[in-house]
Amino acid sequence: MRTLGLDVGTKTIGIAVSDALGWTAQGLETWRRSDANEQADFEHIASLVKEHEVTTIVIGLPKNMDGSIGPSGERSETFAAELRRYVPCEIVMWDERLTTTAAERMLISADVSRKKRKSVIDKMAAVMILQGYLDRQQLK
């Protein structure tokens, strides 16, 4: 049983999946969202859930530094509510403060070009969101 991690943005969705034991997160893809057909986003995620036998989906919840939820966080919560109609999984919202910034710093320190960073940053953020969740589950 695997866990899927999502970094939901307005233009793309970074997607990561756990190994079967739930120890490590691997980047799966960066999905380009369709402006005209939001349903395609949910159907694509539903197909990944089936393909990878996912039981839990972790969605990054952008919070302000004071812990409050702003417009981006509200969009993520709305996305999660809609996704529940497409998948039979547990959906968990996970604090993602600074994950995109941390992912970008990691890629810069690895000397990844700006063009390549742009194509993988959301996937890396999804990996960081999912790995944070998996690490916390191991402590329980």
From Swiss-Prot:
Flavoprotein is among the record's keywords: no
GO cellular component: cytosol
Keywords: Cytoplasm, Hydrolase, Nuclease, Ribosome biogenesis
Single GO BP term: rRNA 5'-end processing
Domain of life assignment: Bacteria
Subcellular location: Cytoplasm
GO molecular function: nuclease activity
Purpose of the protein: Could be a nuclease involved in processing of the 5'-end of pre-16S rRNA.
Protein name listed in UniProt: Putative pre-16S rRNA nuclease
